[in-house]
């Protein structure tokens, strides 16, 4: 059986939000709890590494016990950028691991069904894959100075990318190591693998698997929760 480690990235500074968005309560528990719990409840994920800010280390040590999240076996300090945080987690893996599944702590609404679908695809095909949804709106390239439209992109080939993202362990570790050596900063983990010429595939995700980034996202979240059972 393949050994899978989950990495939950909770080391962001929430600059755009104005407060620690991960601690905002949803039905009595903070956002971060649900993001970890989704991975925790999947039997194929053996262990979880939680990446946190230094000033939150003691808080999470206590809460992981309170929340009975036994699969969280290690807390790792984050870096300056998200990419640094993930690399710190990858370096901390101290046992044989076949795959790594990386998830943003600010995405509490991903379904267990979709995570399991992602795991099945990767392990059965020995491939890397990520969740994403097709773009529905028209996307244009705009000159930020003049605001002139430069190009209209073919949306039939465009996808909005989400997490979790899953990779064979040695591939994602090498991709992060290479990016660090070459001072390359990608917008997600998959972009680091892509630049090595290694294929990454997309599994269609769900529109409600949004990343809570601004107060507007919170309003959207509250509206959805009033009508559903996403957590």
Swiss-Prot record:
List GO BP terms, alphabetically: isopentenyl diphosphate biosynthetic process, methylerythritol 4-phosphate pathway
Similarity section? Belongs to the IspD/TarI cytidylyltransferase family. IspD subfamily.
Family matches, as NCBIfam families: ispD
A GO molecular function assigned to this protein is: 2-C-methyl-D-erythritol 4-phosphate cytidylyltransferase activity
From the UniProt record, list the reaction(s) this protein catalyses.
2-C-methyl-D-erythritol 4-phosphate + CTP + H(+) = 4-CDP-2-C-methyl-D-erythritol + diphosphate
Q: EC no.?
A: 2.7.7.60
Site note Transition state stabilizer applies to: 16, 21
Pathway, according to UniProt? Isoprenoid biosynthesis; isopentenyl diphosphate biosynthesis via DXP pathway; isopentenyl diphosphate from 1-deoxy-D-xylulose 5-phosphate: step 2/6
SUPFAM superfamilies for this protein? Nucleotide-diphospho-sugar transferases (SSF53448)
Domain of life, source organism? Bacteria
Q: Where is this site: Positions MEP for the nucleophilic attack?
A: 155, 211
Which EC class is the enzyme in? transferase
**What organism is recorded for this protein?**
Dictyoglomus thermophilum (strain ATCC 35947 / DSM 3960 / H-6-12)
Can you say what this protein is called?
Answer: 2-C-methyl-D-erythritol 4-phosphate cytidylyltransferase
Q: Which CDD domains match?
A: CDP-ME_synthetase
Q: What does this protein do?
A: Catalyzes the formation of 4-diphosphocytidyl-2-C-methyl-D-erythritol from CTP and 2-C-methyl-D-erythritol 4-phosphate (MEP).
Keywords, A to Z?
A: Isoprene biosynthesis, Nucleotidyltransferase, Transferase
């Amino acid at each position: 059986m393949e050994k899978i480690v989950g990495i939950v990235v909770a080391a962001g500074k929430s600059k755009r939000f104005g407060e620690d968005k991960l601690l905002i309560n949803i039905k009595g528990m903070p956002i971060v709890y649900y993001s970890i719990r989704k991975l925790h409840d999947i039997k194929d994920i053996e262990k979880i590494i939680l990446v946190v800010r230094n000033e939150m280390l003691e808080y999470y040590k206590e809460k992981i016990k309170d929340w009975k999240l036994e699969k969280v076996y290690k807390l790792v300090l984050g870096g300056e950028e998200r990419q640094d945080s993930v690399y710190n987690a990858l370096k901390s893996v101290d046992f044989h691991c076949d795959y790594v599944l990386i998830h943003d702590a600010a995405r509490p609404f991903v379904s267990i069904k979709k995570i399991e679908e992602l795991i099945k695809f990767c392990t059965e095909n020995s491939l890397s894959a990520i969740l994403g949804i097709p773009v529905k709106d028209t996307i244009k390239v705009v000159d930020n100075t003049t605001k002139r439209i430069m190009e209209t992109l073919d949306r039939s080939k465009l996808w909005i990318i989400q997490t979790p993202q899953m990779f064979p362990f040695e591939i994602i570790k090498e991709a992060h190591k290479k990016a660090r050596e070459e001072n390359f900063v990608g917008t997600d983990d998959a972009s680091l693998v892509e630049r090595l010429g290694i294929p990454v595939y997309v599994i269609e995700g769900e529109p409600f698997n949004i990343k809570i980034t601004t107060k507007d996202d919170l309003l959207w979240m509250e509206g959805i929760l009033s009508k559903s059972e996403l957590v």
